[in-house]
Amino acid sequence: LIEIPQIGFDAQSLTGTVQTGLGMYARGIARALEKKRELISLELLWPKDRKPFSATGERILWEMFNLPSKAKAAKSDLIHLPCFGVPRLTSIPRVVTAHDLIILKHPDMMPPGSRWYFSYWIPQSYRSADHIIAVSDCTKNDLVEYLNIKPEKITVVHHGIDQSFFNVPAVENIASVKDRYGIFERFFMMVGSFERRKNVELAIDAFSILAKDHEEVQLVLVGSSSEYRERMIEKANDYGLEDRIIFTGYLQDRDVATLYSICTAFLFPSSHEGFGLPLLEAMAAGAPVIASDIRVLKEIGGDAPCYVQEGKIEALMGSMERMLVDENIREECRVRGRSRAELFSWDDAADKTIEVYMNVLGMRGFDGIPARVT
């Protein structure tokens, strides 16, 4: 009799209506894992009322006590933590996904109220896990360098990409999105949370220079409200560009994919990333990409983006202007980007993740070989 392993999946990052990059990873990998029913049985372990945590204390209470209790009740053979904290008061094997170590490298980039959780609790969680899935080679290297975790305890599994981003949007959807936000024919765009490391301010500064000679172009910034976002709105107003720098707020995937597919170029000038999912989405949708020349974006983007020196306004502005005036460069970037994006899939990520599960559980393979015989 073959017994399929029972995997308890921490679903806290799937709560709420606004999905961050971490939530999008959790959603993508969970959907792909659920399709592997011949290999594993995946059960989503939800917090009470399926609501996001409003305080760090709630999160720790969930990770320390409530999650292990739910996993035990579900008879989980293994717990997968797709984001952050690892429960320690349990004998059930634990696999955690590590996205980045930005808080350890740059603690000033985190809100003071959550620094303890990310600078102490999370490193301890990584050390206590049975195995770590790193979303990039860069994150793996950081885990080894900053936390002295043995390389053999870490497996790199890149994100996948939702196949909907490869679809050509309907003409009526393009018109609808443009009309809704007052978007012109030519525009640059950014997607993501409004944080200093994303270098939104740098993009606004670069655009303010470009805008003087190119009145027909806009900058579209997609992302949820935050205090930093409000400061960026003020900055756009100070430049007198409130009509040409568009803050859309949070958008659903369909509208984001539509904008990717028609933008002049997608900007990703981040100073720090763990993976950079918007980069992958933009390439899949056919957007020419301008990205900062940091290691992780080169790992994910390959030869597809136009790379610029991180933190340099003139370099970013110059690349934006070249994209604006040279259709050949844009087309080359589009072709390379879509080809690169095709190398990433959630199905492949799920297979590699299951391989980690099997290794942690002391099992071997799944091509017709019993996972466990009882």
Task: List each language-model region with its residue ranges.
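Carbohydrate transferase catalytic cores enriched for Leloir-type hexosyltransferases
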Residues: 1-374
